[in-house]
Amino acid sequence: MQDWTIEDSAELYQIHGWGEPYFKINDKGHVAVMPRGEGNGEIDLFHLVQDIQKRGLNMPMLIRFSDILADRIARLNACFVEAIREYDYPGIYKGVYPVKVNQQRHVVEEVVEFGRPFQYGLEAGSKPELLIALATLKTPGALIICNGYKDSEYIETALLAQRLGHTPFVVIERFHELTLLIEAAQKLGIRPLIGVRAKLTARGIGRWGDSTGDRAKFGLSAGEIMEVVAQLKAADLLSSLQLLHFHIGSQISAINVIKTALREASCVYVELAQMGAPMQYCDVGGGLAIDYDGSKTNFRASKNYNMQEYAYDVVAAFQDACRTKNVPVPTLVSESGRAITSHQSVLVFDVMGVSHLQFGEPEPPARNEHSIIRNLYETYTQITPDNVQEAFNDASQFKEEALSLFALGYLGLGERARAERLYWGCCEKILNLVRELDYIPDELADLEKNMASTYYCNFSVFQSAPDSWAIDQLFPIMPIHRLDEEPKARGTLADLTCDSDGKIDQFIDLRDVKGVLELHPVRPEEPYYLGMFLNGAYQEILGDMHNLFGDTNTVHIHLASDEPGEQSYRLEHVVKGDTMTEVLKYVQYDHEAMLESIRRETEQALRERRITLSESRLLLQHYERSLSGYTYLTNELQVELAAR
C-alpha cells in the first residue's frame, strides 16, 4: 500500500477544481494561497495563521486576501476585453460591483481602488447602499446603478449626485417609481439618467430561478415597458432612457440558461432603441457563478462554463441582435458580485474537541445475560463482507426489540446500554467492510454519516456561514495543514451555538454531496485548523448573532512580492471581532449596569457568608474581563502559541 501524498489530499478535497488558480497544497502539506494566481507568489496559510495569533488575535478569524479581489476584477475585465476583440464589438464593458454582496467598508473601498483602471462602478439596492456608493466612488466615468425599491428621497439623492459628477442611473423596477422620478426631475430641474428593468420570461435555474418570470419580485412586463416609454415621451424625458437592466438570478450554473436570457434581453434592447429611446447601456445583472465543488458541471454548487465563455456569450448576443436591426451596440454592464468577492475570504477556525463512536471488540456475554444481548453478540461475530446487508438488518431488528423490552420493563438500563453498544459495534464492523466494497447497498449508504465523529469547532454557522444553514449552500472545507497525512477519521462539524441546526453535515464531492468530511485525529496539545473557502459573498452581512456570537476577527493580507520568504505579506488592516460588551449593547444591555448588578449581588452574598472574599474577587474579575473579551472560546493552547 502506497504512502499518502499531498496529491491524494488535493484529489480528496478537490482543491485543483474549486481552488484554481488561488489555492493549492504545498510541499509541507499546508494550504498555500496564491493571491495573484499560479506562479506569482504564495503564502503558507498555516504559517500565516500562526503569525496572526502571535499578534494577539484568536480564533476564529476571517482572512481577506486583497490581491485576490484585485485579480478577480482584472480577470473579469480582461475576459470582456478579449470577447470584444474576438467579436470585433464596437462597444466597451463597464462593470459594477453590487454593494449588497459584501458591504464591509474595507471591501468596498478596495473594489473601488482596484477597479479604477477599468472605470468599475457600484450598484446600490437601497438608500444606505446609495449613500455608500456616493461617498466611496470617485472614479470618473464609473457608473452607479440605482436598483431596489425607491422613494422620493432616494430618487432625488440620485439625481442631485449628477451635480457632483457622478453617473447614477435610476432603474425603474416598479411602475410606480416612474411617477416619482418624473416629479423629482421636474422639481429639481435635472434631467435624469433612466434605466428600466425587464421582467424576462426566460427562467433562471436553481434557488434563484424565480428572479425572472411573470411572478418575479422586480421588473416590468412588456406592457409596462411600453407604458414607460409613452409616459417619458409625454414628459419630454424619453432621451433620458438609456439603459436596459435584467437579472435572472444568482449562481446560474448552466450556460444555456444565460444564453436564453441574453437572446430575449437583446431583443428588448433593440426594440427600445427602435421606439426612439437613445439606448446606450445594457446591464445584464448578476448570475456569473462560482464553482464551489470543483466539478465544472451544472450542479447547483458548480457551473458548466468559465468566465471567458460567459463574456463571449454576453458580447455575441448583443452583437448579433444589434447588427440584425442596424442598432448601435450598448456599453455592456454586469453585476458580478459573487464572482468578484467569493475567493478573497477564508474563514479559519480551530477544533475544540471530538466525539467519537468507537467501540472496539465487545466482550462475550455471560450465559445468564438476556437472549437479545446474546443474539447481538452472535450477529457481531458472524459479520463478513458477504453478509453485511443481512447482518445490518439483524442487528437493527435486535436493537429495536431491546428498546421495546426496555420500555415494557423487561430489560434494565444496563442491559439496554449493553445492547446499544453491541448494535453500534456491529455498525462499526459493517462500515469498515463496506468501505472496501465496489457497490454499497442503499440501506447501508447512510452508515458512514451515522457513524461519523463530531468535531466541535470554534465558530458559529449562523454568524460565519449563514447560507450553509439557510439554503444548504456548499462551501469547500478542509484542514489547512497535515495534508501529507491520510485523514482516517470521518466527521461532521458542530459549532458553538446551543442549536441543533448549528452544524455542517453536507460537504462537496466530485459526483454528489457527501455527508461526512475526511479529517485527521486531533492530537493532544496540538491545534487542528480547518478552513472554509469561497465565503466572501453575502456571508458576512447575512450573519446573525445567534447565542450572541458576534463578528469574528478579520485581517486583510496583501502580498509583498519584494519581500521573499515566508513573511512575504503585509497585514493591511486588522478589524477586531465583537467583544461581549458590543454584542450585549446590540440587544440593549448596558455593561456598566450589568457589572453594578453583579457587584451588589456579590456584596449581598458576602454579608450572608455565601461566598468568600477571594471567590467574590475572582467572580468579578472573570465577569469584568469577559465583558471586554471575544465572544468566541479562547483555547488555552491558542494563548500558549501566541506567547511563543
UniProtKB/Swiss-Prot annotation:
Which cofactors are reported in the record for this sequence? Mg(2+); pyridoxal 5'-phosphate
Q: Which reaction does it catalyse?
A: L-arginine + H(+) = agmatine + CO2
Task: Please cite one Gene Ontology biological process associated with this protein.
Answer: arginine catabolic process
> One Pfam family name from the record?
Arg_decarbox_C
Name the CDD domains for this protein: PLPDE_III_ADC (cd06830)
Where N6-(pyridoxal phosphate)lysine occurs, the residues are K100
Molecular function (GO) terms for this protein are: arginine decarboxylase activity; metal ion binding
> What is this enzyme's EC?
4.1.1.19
Residues binding substrate are C282, D283, V284, G285, G286, G287, L288, A289, I290, D291, Y292
List the keywords (alphabetical).
Answer: Decarboxylase, Lyase, Magnesium, Metal-binding, Polyamine biosynthesis, Pyridoxal phosphate, Spermidine biosynthesis
Question: Which Gene3D superfamilies does this chain map to?
Answer: 1.10.287.3440, 1.20.58.930, Alanine racemase (3.20.20.10), Lyase, Ornithine Decarboxylase, Chain A, domain 1 (2.40.37.10)
Q: What does this protein do?
A: Catalyzes the biosynthesis of agmatine from arginine.
| Family, similarity comment | Belongs to the Orn/Lys/Arg decarboxylase class-II family. SpeA subfamily.
Q: What is this protein called?
A: Biosynthetic arginine decarboxylase
Provenance organism: Gloeobacter violaceus (strain ATCC 29082 / PCC 7421)
Taxonomic lineage per UniProt? Bacteria, Bacillati, Cyanobacteriota, Cyanophyceae, Gloeobacterales
